[in-house]
Amino acid sequence: MSELAKFFIEVAEKWQRRWAEAKVFEPSPQPGRPKFFITAAYPYPNGTIHIGHGRTYLVADVMARFRRHLGYNVLFPMAFHYTGTPILTIAEVIAAGDKAVIEEYKEIYGVSDDDIKKMGDPLYLAQYFHRRSKEAMIKFGLGIDWSREFTTIDPEYQRFIQWQFEKLRKRGLIVRGRHPVGWCPRHQMPVGAHDTKDDKEPEIGQWTLIYFVDGEGLVYPTATLRPETVPGVTNIWINPDAEYVVAEFEGRKMVLSKDAAYRLSFQGNVKVIREARGREFVGRRVLNPVTGEWVPVYEAKFVDPKVGTGVVMSVPAHAPYDYAALRDMGEVKLIPLIRVEGYGEYPAKEVVERMGIKSQTDPALEEATREVYSAEYTRGVVREDVVDRIAPHLPEPARSMVRAVFKLYFAGRPVKEAREFISKWLAEAGLGGVMYDIMNKPVYCRCGTEIVVKVLEDQWFINYGERGWKQLARQLVEEMAIIPQEAKAQFLATIDWLDKRACARTRGLGTPLPWSQGWVIESLSDSTIYMAFYTVIKKIRALGLRPEQLTEEFWDYVFLGQGSAAEVAKRIGVDPAALEEIRREFDYWYPLDSRNSGKDLIPNHLTFFIFNHVAIFPREKWPRQIVANGWVLREGEKMSKSKRNVLPLDKAVALYGPDPLRATLAIAAEVEQDLDFRDAEARRNSQQLMSIYNLVQRLAQSAVEREETWLDKWLISEVAHVLERAREAYEKVRLRQAAVELLYNAEAVFSQYLSMVDKPSKSAVEAAKAWVVALEPIVPHFAEELWQILGGEGFAATAPWPKLSPDPAALLAKRYVDMLIEDVKNIPAYKAGAKRVAIYVNGNYQWLRAAVGKDVKAAIEAGAPPQLAKRLVDFAKSMGEEVRGLVERVEQFDEYAALQSYKRYVEKALGVPVDIYKADDPQAPDLGGKKKAALPLKPGIFIEVG
């Protein structure tokens, strides 16, 4: 631990104790006072939280602290998510003696051998990392109300979740049936993002299978995402070196890759008859079920047996990879199917040639494929003459009937419509089927097993596909604030594709499904409305309510206002006044004002949060805002356990100290951006905080009581502007912008001020107090220490947001002096070696005001001599926009007094003595005839060369 880190940790521990003693972050309802209720995603205690979690919690903490300064009654609570399989899986792996995982936990998290031995018990593991993570949050300086802490296996919480699920079931939003889910073959259970390594959500996609058949009746089920192109198939691809099987599936003998047969076995009954190499099937001919054409089976080593069925159809007119491969073989046959504006008959050929692709191994084929597929899907229309290729092998009248259907629903239709039609038609005609797959494979369970798709029977699902529910969810997304704004489109897209989702499992920690024994509600389903539970758990415990008293009637009254307090209280055996008190607590804090999480939770948790709120709560209790921050990298790389570069939050605090760490996580990127955490940046911010500390100490120790000068007024004005910009940044959750203003720009202003004055004034101390209050949300312990040094009363954390008024005249004086210094430095005589500088001030400021934005006549009418009027107007035009604006606002300005006030600053900047004269003073020497050259804010300058 460095000396700097030690200093910041000691400061932090002092103020953490004082906050806890004063219960600064434990609010109670205050009717009439505005409230701000913010939550961030509670963590899984299957490991210690890391700096990625720290960033999410920091954003929420900064928002909470800022609102407290604005006078809000702020609630920021925290809990721990024990539900699901992550904790159970890790405990099992450790109990089994998995050396890699054990070393990982010892190296990354610093777990002792004694604790490792006990972690075979899932509850011990959870409680260990719960404790470590909570300690890390406290050390990090999060202003959390720990009096409302709970875990998701607490009996009170389980009663709450059972109430939620009964509500969903009674509204028809929980169903039982057949549906594809991500599945761990080892644990024999559905999985979601929180059950997988790196929290990777298994993305389930659907292949259309098209049954090509050889002369022996063997089916070659091509798996495709583009079934509308089947009329243009010229051949089939099979990998000659891959392992295939002949297997029975859905009553047919099929050729499948061995891997595909394994994956399909979770979706239906697969019986492997024999194994074979792919080359056995190369050279055969198969019948296209749509066109009746016999097409060859070619070998292609680019076919991945782990994708689809390992059997691929080739459409060279519309697939760049197919075109390039067949061109290499000299076997190109092109059949046009889709018209796209801006492309010719054969889009794949056209794009391959335009991009200069020479072979089937060219990496540019990926880009070519994206271009063609995107253009055809978004703008493509199936050609009308495709009908002539349909079913020529069928006898009449079947041929005419099929062609009539294709003419109506396929030919001339947009690709999207044609795709939906032909997929359905193939299945209904028995010429195709469906295969589900993990489209973002490989995805691994935390136990190390690769996830597959299983079609479950009699599984419990939350039906996120229900249309009316989707519409309510869209309505909330459109109404609420979402930061960043561009994430709104991702929420709407997620709402569109969400369908049934498995909501219960047969193993793991959590809440039992209330109406079906043996099922446990899974982790992404019991974590959608728990924000409401924060508002009441403290009172439930304080009043000594038992879990069995927390009935459906209890929750209906507390959260929905249904029933009367007297009747409900009588039935559950509590005091009606106590019940009303709990209801008032919820009613005061809800709705949630901001929900904070990482952007990776948009496709699951955050969208489920929206769905469940609109399903259960009345409109006035719907959440108001979501903030989704970017990821955290470390030294340019994604953090992962395999790379051993995960930085636990408690280790980071020990390494840098909490406030330098907070400053770095705030300043390194705006909330919507991914943040690259770098050691050098953290150390630089640590040094910057020490510079601020030394500056404030110097200011506090040397300040004197005296009349305010131009310099004091300038300082206050600059700080007022910094605070104004910082406040706007905080309000927009632009933490980087706020941190730059407060950690660097403000420090530069104070440093310059101290360099300009002999002794700082007491008004400068008041300006520093204002700065410290604005700093507090980002570096709270450090701010408290500075607040104490400056003589602030109470806590900086609870001080109101400062009100400083900028003085335009003081700002004008400083800008004027800086312009003067620049003018002198640009004079050749000064560059040649100045010995002394004489400055002649024209005090007729009103002439310049009249000239700003006006003409010569206006300047003359204001009293300017005709011989100076044009120069005045030209000078007014040359002034920067800021100075021009200040001149328009400042009615009276004593240029001579301002310059005298800044004399020391000017002499220091120029490095020579400076004499200041009034241009109209007859007693003043007219060196070089510079009196008459003086204009308001542009004095005459004489330089004595040594």
UniProtKB/Swiss-Prot annotation:
GO terms for molecular function: aminoacyl-tRNA deacylase activity; ATP binding; leucine-tRNA ligase activity. GO terms for biological process: leucyl-tRNA aminoacylation. A motif ('HIGH' region) lies at residues 43-53. Its EC number is 6.1.1.4. One of its GO terms (cellular component) is cytoplasm. A motif ('KMSKS' region) lies at residues 638-642. Disulfide bonds: none annotated. Keywords: Aminoacyl-tRNA synthetase, ATP-binding, Cytoplasm, Ligase, Nucleotide-binding, Protein biosynthesis. It catalyses: tRNA(Leu) + L-leucine + ATP = L-leucyl-tRNA(Leu) + AMP + diphosphate. InterPro entries: aa-tRNA-synth_I_CS, aa-tRNA-synth_Ia, Leu-tRNA-lgase_arc, Leu-tRNA-synth_Ia_arc/euk, M/V/L/I-tRNA-synth_anticd-bd, Rossmann-like_a/b/a_fold, tRNAsynth_Ia_anticodon-bd, Val/Leu/Ile-tRNA-synth_edit. Gene3D superfamilies: Class I aminoacyl-tRNA synthetases (RS), HUPs, Isoleucyl-tRNA Synthetase, Domain 1, leucyl-tRNA synthetase, Valyl/Leucyl/Isoleucyl-tRNA synthetase, editing domain. It is found in: Cytoplasm. ATP binds at residue 641. Belongs to the class-I aminoacyl-tRNA synthetase family. This is Leucine--tRNA ligase. It comes from Pyrobaculum calidifontis (strain DSM 21063 / JCM 11548 / VA1). The gene is leuS.
